[in-house]
């Protein structure tokens, strides 16, 4: 039977572990809130860019580029971004739930593909038999331009090569 001292040590150890876990959760929540804030700040810029690009390309018929082609959407590629770990509240669950709902509403069969960014999503999709075209794991909180460019070039390549239409 364990002595009183052993039991007290076990209780203290459990409390310390609990404090560490709570601190990690608070840090993750803070990072998530910062990312959400940055996303909201980016939206007006993105909308203005779309407006400017639409004006430029709408007035010029001489500009030809595969990304500007209008074509029927037969096959869709989704870029799903989750975290690498589970310490971010309901973020991963919400992203996956929204993705699954979208796929169920829009697609009757496997006319879509997934580029999974983050361990959590990549593992979920692999375990559940989804069509994962590509996955990127262990992306840092603030990825470098080179890392983002690599992913972007691959995704744009799928569209240009007409593997996916949207």
Give the role of each language-model region.
Residues 2-166:
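Conserved loop-to-helix interface motifs that mediate assembly, gating, or partner/ligand docking
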């Amino acid at each position: 039977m364990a002595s009183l001292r052993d039991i007290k040590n076990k209780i203290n150890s459990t409390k310390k572990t609990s404090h560490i876990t709570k601190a990690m959760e608070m840090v993750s929540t803070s990072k998530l809130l910062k990312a959400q804030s940055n996303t909201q700040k980016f939206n007006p810029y993105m909308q203005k860019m779309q407006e400017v690009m639409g004006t430029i390309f709408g007035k010029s018929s001489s500009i030809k580029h595969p990304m500007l082609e209008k074509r029927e959407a037969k096959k869709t590629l989704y870029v799903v971004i989750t975290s690498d770990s589970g310490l971010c509240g309901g973020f991963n669950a919400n992203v996956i739930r929204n993705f699954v709902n979208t796929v169920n509403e829009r697609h009757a069969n496997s006319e879509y593909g997934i580029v999974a960014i983050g361990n959590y999503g990549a593992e979920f999709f692999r375990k559940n038999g989804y069509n994962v075209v590509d996955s990127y794991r262990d992306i840092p909180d603030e990825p470098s331009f080179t890392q983002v460019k690599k992913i972007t070039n691959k995704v744009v390549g799928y569209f240009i090569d007409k593997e996916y239409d949207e």
